[in-house]
Structure formats: structure tokens, C-alpha cells
């Protein structure tokens, strides 16, 4: 009986030891991943021009970037060449791929946003297309699922482009292929699937943001949104 009891005690002790070892292994793996993440972190700062954050949580006044025109769409002149190259590569995937939107001033965004709100209120909107009127509060909630208030849109940076092979968005069979090549030209899909908690915006397969080659590569490899990436960088 004593031997059985002792064995039982030994077995229990081993189980606890195994559990501790497994926990230690998981902690070690997690730590290793964090070390690896920081080890290949680009030499970048939160204040870099191509990493500026504009959102409902981080609104900005008019930024007045120097603009250039690519295929009829205005963008920050510093990314014009990258936009042209990215578009050309995307058109190799789908010849119908085209730029839909680029830079928008704060005043332009305000007019656009208010027109969307009015359309939703009248029942002629993207979400409320029933023909039945709704309150302004309801309309604003609807609009914020697909458009941002003035001072909260990345388009005012001149670093964001909307690009698709169709004008009815989130329906392209080529979208994932285009998103996959984006980092080669310094772009990331700004609002990917499963990241609404981080960005505040649902999946948009057409909205690309220029962040620079090294940043785009790192963000893609580590599945990071701009919000998550900036937290890893010094000010």
C-alpha cells in the first residue's frame, strides 16, 4: 500500500512537472516570437511621413501634400511612381484594374460624407436603400460602415488609394491576388479581414495605403495593421 501510494505521489508529481514544462515551453516560444519580431523590425519611427495615422481616433487637420496625378487620380507626389508601378502590376492580374480614388481634401471629404448621410436619411443610401426615411443618428451609423468623417479619412494624406477592377467593391475575385503583390510596391491592404477591432473599419479589399517597402514587408509578414505596427516603433 505504501508503494502504491508512493507511486501515486510520484505520478502526480510528474504530471505537475510536465504541466510546468509545457507552460515554460509555450512561454519560451511566445518570447522567441516577440524577440524575432523585434529583431527584424525596420529602422522606422512613428513620426515618419509614410506612417502617419489618420482615423476617427486620430483625426488630423488638412495636410496639404504636394500632389501628382496618376491616371487621373491625385496622390502625394512622393508615391506617384509606386502607385503607377503597383497599378501596372495589378493590371497584369486583371486588365480592368483601375484607380477609383486618391487624395481628398478635408473639405471635399466633408461634402462627400454629408451627401452620404443625407442619402441614408432619405432611404437612397448604400445601407438604407429601402426608400424609407431614417433618423440622422441612424444614417451616420450606416455611413461610418463605409466612409469616414472629415479629418478622419486616410485619403487626406495622399498616401491612400482605392483600386479595383469593378466599381461595386468587395466583390472582386482578383482582390486577394492584388493584395498579395501590394508590399512589393510599398503598399498594404489597410483594412484586412479580421482586424476591425484594431482599425475600427471592416474589410475593404480596395483600399491600399502606402507605408514604404520595408514597413510593408514587415507588416505583411507579421500580419499587422498600421495601428499595431506603430505600437512597436519609437516616437
Predicted segments with their positions:
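Extracytoplasmic cell-surface/polysaccharide-interacting catalytic and binding patches
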Residues: 1-235
Amino acid at each position: 500500500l505504501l508503494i502504491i501510494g508512493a507511486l501515486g505521489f510520484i505520478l502526480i508529481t510528474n504530471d505537475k512537472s510536465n504541466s510546468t514544462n509545457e507552460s515554460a515551453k509555450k512561454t519560451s516560444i511566445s518570447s522567441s516570437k516577440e524577440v524575432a519580431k523585434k529583431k527584424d523590425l525596420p529602422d522606422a519611427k512613428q513620426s515618419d511621413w509614410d506612417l502617419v495615422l489618420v482615423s476617427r481616433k486620430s483625426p488630423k487637420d488638412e495636410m496639404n501634400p504636394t500632389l501628382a496625378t496618376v491616371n487621373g487620380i491625385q496622390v502625394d507626389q512622393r508615391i506617384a511612381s509606386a502607385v503607377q508601378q503597383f497599378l501596372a502590376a495589378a493590371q497584369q492580374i486583371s486588365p480592368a484594374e483601375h484607380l477609383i480614388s486618391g487624395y481628398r481634401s478635408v473639405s471635399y471629404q466633408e461634402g462627400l460624407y454629408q451627401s452620404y448621410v443625407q442619402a441614408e436619411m432619405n432611404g437612397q443610401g448604400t445601407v438604407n436603400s429601402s426608400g424609407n426615411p431614417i433618423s440622422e443618428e441612424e444614417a451616420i451609423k450606416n455611413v461610418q460602415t463605409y466612409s469616414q468623417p472629415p479629418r478622419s479619412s486616410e485619403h487626406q494624406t495622399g498616401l491612400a488609394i482605392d483600386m479595383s477592377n469593378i466599381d461595386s467593391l468587395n466583390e472582386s475575385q482578383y482582390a486577394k491576388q492584388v493584395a498579395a503583390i501590394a508590399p512589393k510596391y510599398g503598399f498594404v491592404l489597410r483594412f484586412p479581414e479580421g482586424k476591425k477591432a484594431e482599425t475600427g473599419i471592416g474589410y475593404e479589399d480596395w483600399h491600399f495605403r502606402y507605408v514604404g517597402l520595408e514597413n510593408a514587408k514587415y507588416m505583411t509578414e507579421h500580419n499587422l495593421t498600421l495601428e499595431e505596427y506603430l505600437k512597436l516603433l519609437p516616437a
